[in-house]
Amino acid sequence: MSGNTGERSFADIITSIRYWVIHSITIPSLFIAGWLFVSTGLAYDVFGSPRPNEYFTDSRQEVPLITGRFDSLEQLDEFTRSF
């Protein structure tokens, strides 16, 4: 026989009006905030990733692929010089 911890049951929580009032506001708000974060380009600025039109420049149209096992540092320096 288990004791009572004083917590409400899950079924009691999800059937309450208070739960749905709170979550009907917060879940769409989080979705809209995430959409704005990505659509305004702020996500690119915060995380430092290039925008889709910045992956390939006019001077560099090839994929920056490291092919050498022993000269990988030189290849990496060559790729980063073009930025």
Swiss-Prot record:
- Keywords on this record? Chloroplast, Electron transport, Heme, Iron, Membrane, Metal-binding, Photosynthesis, Photosystem II, Plastid, Thylakoid, Transmembrane, Transmembrane helix, Transport
Cofactor annotation: heme b
Q: Which GO terms describe its cellular component?
A: chloroplast thylakoid membrane; photosystem II reaction center
Q: Which InterPro entries match?
A: PSII_cyt_b559_asu (IPR006217), PSII_cyt_b559_asu_sf (IPR037025), PSII_cyt_b559_CS (IPR006216), PSII_cyt_b559_N (IPR013081), PSII_cytb559_asu_lum (IPR013082)
Q: Provide the GO biological process annotations.
A: photosynthetic electron transport chain
This molecule's function is given as: This b-type cytochrome is tightly associated with the reaction center of photosystem II (PSII). PSII is a light-driven water:plastoquinone oxidoreductase that uses light energy to abstract electrons from H(2)O, generating O(2) and a proton gradient subsequently used for ATP formation. It consists of a core antenna complex that captures photons, and an electron transfer chain that converts photonic excitation into a charge separation.
Q: How does it assemble?
A: Heterodimer of an alpha subunit and a beta subunit. PSII is composed of 1 copy each of membrane proteins PsbA, PsbB, PsbC, PsbD, PsbE, PsbF, PsbH, PsbI, PsbJ, PsbK, PsbL, PsbM, PsbT, PsbX, PsbY, PsbZ, Psb30/Ycf12, at least 3 peripheral proteins of the oxygen-evolving complex and a large number of cofactors. It forms dimeric complexes.
Listed name of the protein: Cytochrome b559 subunit alpha
Origin species, per record, is Ginkgo biloba
Write the gene name: psbE
